[in-house]
């Protein structure tokens, strides 16, 4: 920040070249925080085993539910594999959804510090 000085050492105010950029940065931070808070209300689902297992997760990385066909309980190893696969897919979907929503705000601006 520079001061404009006239003759005799008088100051005519301050020039703040970065204030506009800082305001944009702050607005984006506020929007991102608002988005982060909204993630607890956004859900995604995934399936494995041809729909035998369904996992629903919130976009704040919280698993909401796991549904499965009772017949899967007969083969514990397969049941475990399908649960893990559905959870991993749900988490990938959460990450994808978060990135999509964030890119709407940031707009791939490449602004540092965000």
From Swiss-Prot:
Family statement: Belongs to the YbaB/EbfC family.
Subcellular location, principal: cytoplasm
Keyword Nuclease applies: no
Swiss-Prot/TrEMBL keywords: Cytoplasm, DNA-binding
Protein name (Swiss-Prot/TrEMBL): Nucleoid-associated protein Tlet_0999
GO CC aspect terms: bacterial nucleoid; cytosol
Pfam families reported in the protein's UniProt record: YbaB_DNA_bd
Functional note: Binds to DNA and alters its conformation. May be involved in regulation of gene expression, nucleoid organization and DNA protection.
Organism: Pseudothermotoga lettingae (strain ATCC BAA-301 / DSM 14385 / NBRC 107922 / TMO) (Thermotoga lettingae)
